[in-house]
């Protein structure tokens, strides 16, 4: 049982975010998360020698350093009575442990099958959503998912994973690509356009084919913006990517400089100080909507800069190495790079139970482990 949990704990952890994203199953998702955290923590404690070999593995050293930074920050700026900070500290530590252990004990599965299974689960969610709500263009489409942006995250990543697969596409897979593309656009998420463009860039680079696709996309763009819909293209044309973000960036910036050096604490990720929000806007759900500002708000400029340095350094390492490798799944690198772009306008890479954030950390750890094992074999 424990061996199975070590191998597939990351799968449960990731797919549970789907339950959390569906209003009718959110309560179940909350319970699954708590049980997984508790059981995995016990499994770690009763297998100290095995876990030591994993957590101290050179490929996962960047995750260990981030965990140690969290512990160090907690000891300096928090007390044992800060329950929410303790929850974040433990959840982040177990999250990184789940990822590291899964890759170490089940590497071949995550290299050859996991991404396919991920696409299948998302496609299943899409099909079930269409059974209950097939009206794609009456507004921002959400299907089963309570938040249209979350559905866009699911479908655009599934589209990219399937699109970047080098295997010859079957007719059914071509149909799935078209379906995922249409669903992604119908969500009204402007970030979908960036994700799809990035996927084409990963696939074809700056080639003649991509130039042709760019002209084709531009033609479709001008066609759709003249139709009264609420798709990603229409919203991008009328609002731009950052239209409703600048004010929230301003509040995040003002919040950071209230405690610039050491931040507001581990329990204050995506935090905005209420005192900087105008009275007329209080009561609305306002957050940084920027992963980098969220980290600086949480940790301050000193610890936050160290964390961002570790993230970007590891990203550069695996990206540079990947250019020389034809074996590693390109989709993992896409997940990492797209998350860094998305973090400019969404609170990404800092939370615990967010789909793309989990995949981001998993992708970094997976490519780091792939790089280590390949270099070691050579």
What role is predicted for each listed range?
Residues 1-5, 49, 164-169, 361-378:
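A juxtamembrane structural motif centered on a specific transmembrane helix
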Residues 5-8, 54-67, 93, 100-128, ...:
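Interfacial loop-to-transmembrane-helix boundary motif in multi-pass membrane proteins
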Residues 32-37, 59-72, 81-104:
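Aromatic-anchored transmembrane helix interface
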Residues 37-42, 333-378:
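Transmembrane alpha-helices of multi-pass inner-membrane enzymes
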Residues 57-61, 170-172, 204, 208-215, ...:
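Hydrophobic transmembrane alpha-helices and their immediate junctions
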Residues 102-105, 109-137, 146-206, 313:
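Alpha-helical transmembrane segments of multi-pass inner-membrane proteins
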Residues 142, 235-250, 254-258, 262-299:
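Long extracytoplasmic/lumenal interhelical loops at the membrane interface
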Residues 186-187, 204-240, 253-258, 266:
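A membrane-periplasm/extracellular boundary helix in multi-pass inner-membrane enzymes
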């Amino acid at each position: 049982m424990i061996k199975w949990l070590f191998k597939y704990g990351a799968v449960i952890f990731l797919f549970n975010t789907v339950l959390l994203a569906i209003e009718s199953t959110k309560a179940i998702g909350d319970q699954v998360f708590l049980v997984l955290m508790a059981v995995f923590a016990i499994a770690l404690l009763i297998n100290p020698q095995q876990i030591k070999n994993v957590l101290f593995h050179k490929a996962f050293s960047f995750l260990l350093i981030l965990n140690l930074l969290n512990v160090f920050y907690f000891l300096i700026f928090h007390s044992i009575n800060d329950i929410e900070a303790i929850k974040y500290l433990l959840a982040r530590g177990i999250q990184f442990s789940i990822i590291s252990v899964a890759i170490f004990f089940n590497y071949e599965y995550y290299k050859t099958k996991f991404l396919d299974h991920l696409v299948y689960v998302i496609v299943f969610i899409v099909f079930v959503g269409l059974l209950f709500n097939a009206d794609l263009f009456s507004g921002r489409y959400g299907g089963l998912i309570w938040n249209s942006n979350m559905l866009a995250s699911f479908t655009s990543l599934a589209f990219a994973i399937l699109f970047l697969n080098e295997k010859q596409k079957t007719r059914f897979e071509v149909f799935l690509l078209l379906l995922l593309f249409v669903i992604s656009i119908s969500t009204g998420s402007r970030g979908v356009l960036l994700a799809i463009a990035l996927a084409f860039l990963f696939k074809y680079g700056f080639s003649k084919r991509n130039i042709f696709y760019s002209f084709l996309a531009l033609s479709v763009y001008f066609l759709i913006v003249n139709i009264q819909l609420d798709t990603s293209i229409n919203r991008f044309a009328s609002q731009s990517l950052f239209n409703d973000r600048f004010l929230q960036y301003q509040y995040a910036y003002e919040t950071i400089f209230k405690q610039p050096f050491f931040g507001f604490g581990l329990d204050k990720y995506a935090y905005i100080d209420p005192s900087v929000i105008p009275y007329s806007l209080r009561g609305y759900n306002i957050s940084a909507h920027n992963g980098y500002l969220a980290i600086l708000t949480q940790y301050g400029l000193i610890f936050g800069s160290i964390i961002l340095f570790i993230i970007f350094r590891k990203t550069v390492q695996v990206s540079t190495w990947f250019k020389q490798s034809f074996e590693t799944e390109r989709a993992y690198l896409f997940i990492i790079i797209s998350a860094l772009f998305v973090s400019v306008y969404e609170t990404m890479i800092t939370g615990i139970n967010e789909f793309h954030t989990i995949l981001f950390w998993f992708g970094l750890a997976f490519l780091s482990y792939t790089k280590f094992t390949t270099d070691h074999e050579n």
